[in-house]
């Protein structure tokens, strides 16, 4: 039977998804299932790793069944995943020793504070991992599990525990424990991987007291990792041939193959990446240096700005405040008024990312008067997403010396035309939205397809990607500058709140 499709395994922060693509990049079928968000304490976020695997394997089977595609028609699987979220499990039983600790979780802030007391080590971490010391990354989360779960430290020292980001956890389960591996992009998000030597960093592992025996093998983003176990997907042994963290996969899906090309993904968080070529560029502006992907042992590097809360602020005004019935309603209410009337919402629910890196910042609404209505709050929430993206992209301009020559966008929130137009206005730049909104999944299948010869080369990939809509700035630069100054003042009000008032 001909291999006409590639299956994207897209494991996100709030849902597990499976997407079947054909050779022209068309979507045959999407299946999706949300899973439980666990909040044991203020600032703590967890997932049940077994529920992640259960929902992910379920939607894979559902996509095949309802897409009327047989497993042996799948040429390869590409995996893309929420990054930094980490699982520690028993090597023999495959059972997690604790819930997955999610990238948003701030429980290891005190561990990070301890590291920051050693400026030389902080410098070492930045120069060798490309990251700042923050609870966002996997390394301190693993240390917390080993230090706080009964018996975990002893088992780890005895070589009985494994760890991995979500891609590694899925590969382990898809292959029934035959493959314990990750790719360069996911490894570069752990704060444990040396992006210069391309090895796990022994100095950092020793500092955090994490045994190297727990760590997965690191492979190219476009490479056959192994095949699915015959019991996993209807008896077929399908090559797992592409793996990348969600933001890296999106950069690849946008065909940002040349130095200086950039994209912004609007999901739970908001993430901008710029391709900086085959050598790392280190930021003076609070950006992260990361590995975008690797092919044939050669990494492509990127600068990244990370915003922790983007689309999640719309979930909050829907579920937490009850201001809208659906996320789509936010656009309707935002366009009922001409402006926020001076209201700003800073969604620092779990701290602030680039360029502030303030673990203790908390959510703030400023500028409220007796005239403030729910429309103003809703519009301010949407505008906050765009302002945070501008914070990041301004940093990229400073670090690279390049003006933003348009921005490629993707993610659920790009369906909100108000947000995209406001983003174009506030950046004073063109915004391009592709026809395929599932760009993260597309990036994963592009990587997998190249590895198995499904597509010939990157030039062929470029011919598949087409633009649906372009947004041009409609607001003058003086008005933009005035509004942006207000945002910066609002951010100042949110900083260090938990530190001062906890």
From Swiss-Prot:
Q: What pathway is this protein a component of?
A: Polyol metabolism; glycerol degradation via glycerol kinase pathway; sn-glycerol 3-phosphate from glycerol: step 1/1
Query: Tell me, what's a Pfam family for it?
Result: FGGY_C
**Protein residues bound to sn-glycerol 3-phosphate:** 13, 83-84, 136, 246
Single GO cellular component annotation?
Answer: cytosol
Q: Where does ATP bind?
A: 13-15, 268, 311, 315, 412
Asked if the Swiss-Prot or TrEMBL record annotates the protein with the keyword ATP-binding, the reply is: yes
Q: Which InterPro entries match?
A: ATPase_NBD, Carb_kinase_FGGY, Carb_kinase_FGGY_CS, FGGY_C, FGGY_N, Glycerol_kin
Could you list the residue ranges that cross the membrane?
A: none
Please give the function described in this protein's UniProt entry: Key enzyme in the regulation of glycerol uptake and metabolism. Catalyzes the phosphorylation of glycerol to yield sn-glycerol 3-phosphate.
| Family the entry assigns | Belongs to the FGGY kinase family.
Query: What name goes with this protein?
Result: Glycerol kinase
Organism the protein comes from: Francisella tularensis subsp. tularensis (strain SCHU S4 / Schu 4)
